[in-house]
Amino acid sequence: MTNAIAEGVRAAQKLSMQISGMQRQPVDISNYVMGIKCGGSDATSGLASNCVIGYVADKIVDLGGTVVFGETTEFIGAEHILARRGVTPEVGAKIFEKVAAMEARAKSLGCDMRKGQPTPGNIAGGLSSIEEKSLGAIVKSGTKPIQGVMEYADIVTDQKGLWIKDTPGREIEILTGMAATGAQCILSVSCTHLRAHE
């Protein structure tokens, strides 16, 4: 482990030296890619914090930028709402397909996503069902049409507007995936009081 840490420190120092002479430059917002994610949910998530992220997402899209959101597990029970926002029927069908595939993967491992949610922390925070949790989660995507569905390893090239990325909900995996997609910024909110219950 010590060697890995030392190598990481050396790599970071080398990168720091390489970029130290660079000057910041204005960049048009159309080149901006933002990832969005929410953490532990409670009864206020869909009423406050996720609404703010949704508002920001709409503004970025209006200005010509790209917004990518994921957490396919957080679509269960609300996938029909997201599907209606697809720019084509094919996009809507792809959303249903991704949710069904995720549920099938979980069931193959003995886990029923619809019966295991909401978590005890979500319930302590005032959520009563997986559908209620998902409705609060999808608010973070704003109101704009969904342009398409990206695979986990897909990179933003010339895509604009709002996109779904097929990702798990766990922080490490989704945040890594969003960064690899090309997101220069990832907005993530969580309800801290839930951590004691989960």
Regions found by a protein language model. Give the residues of each.
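Anionic-ligand anchoring segments at beta-strand to alpha-helix junctions in alpha/beta enzyme folds, i.e.
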Residues: G142-T143, A153-I155
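Short, hydrophobic beta-strand segments
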Residues: I36-G40
